[in-house]
Amino acid sequence: MQPYQLSDLKPGSLLGGFRILEVYPEGRGGMARVVRARPLKGEDQQAALKISRTGGNQDYFFAAIQKEVEILQKLDHRGVVRLKPVSEGKNPFKERAVEITDSPWFFGMEVLRGGSLEAYLRGLGALSLAEAAAVCHQVGTTLEYIHREGFAHNDVKPDNILFRRELKVGERLEPVLIDFGVAAKLVRPQLDGSVVYMAPERLQESREPSAPELLASGDPSKADVWSMGILLYRLLVGREPFLGLTDRSVTSAILRAIPPSMMKRRQDLPRELDQFVIEGCLAKEPKLRVSMREFNSVIDRYSGDWRVKRAPKNRRRLPWRR
């Protein structure tokens, strides 16, 4: 059979021991494509397959996806996406896609049925304090575990937080972190990850803001704290503190601008929480930020019950240092 191009992936295509059922939309600047597939034989359990990009910089993309598998094999937490076997080889969790030109690497994951936090937030605007804190505490405890295991996620954002089960009104939400593609400490040929949620130290290490190497200096876990501060801000206010028309303008704001107080847009928030986010999470200097453990300790004080409000239309000595 003649190999096909990665861009020609479609339902019905064969990939390893799987038949593709659905091709998910390609993410902006992504290093891989993701499809939903069914095994050709054996158990009838579906898997999400992540396939490395080909073409320019493909050696980097191939290495990154293999590193992602290695990281996920070392993590065992309900808040981290679970691997699924794709081959009977030495490492059953990764395989070459010989059906595709250049035989890119791919690996399998559980299918997460509830969509992304980004999709859930559309149309909701801001969440209540108890709900926002519950979201961030659940994701934060997952990140605290990841940090203990010696890794930093480096791309925490609503698009990379999915829900394990299909969303039903009144049920509790179970967020799961996906996409560990930039968790590996590799030299980056381009700006991987979402700039809006990116910490300043990850932007400063390049002479050109549009092409940073993205190697976090000092304690890389502090970049995740920054992203959680941005996420909490978004959940409470309905928008991120640093926005712009281009990645370059967002980069400039992250590096130079002081984030506006959340209380300017929402007066019912506790002043100490506003100070915690602005000074404890979004400090420009990583060493001035709290640890993920401190973040979780503070956020847990505000956390409440978090249940689905609506099913999505498209299925597709600072005061906190105690």
What are the roles of these predicted feature ranges?
Residues 98-116:
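Conserved short submotifs of the Hanks-type protein kinase catalytic core
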Residues 116-127:
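AlphaC helix of the protein kinase catalytic domain
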Residues 268-282:
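Conserved C-terminal C-lobe helix
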Residues 135-136:
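Activation segment signature within eukaryotic-like protein kinase domains
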Residues 237-241:
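Structural helix C-cap motif within protein kinase domains
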Residues 141-151:
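Protein kinase catalytic-loop region centered on the HRD/HxD motif
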Residues 56-74:
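AlphaC helix of the eukaryotic protein kinase fold
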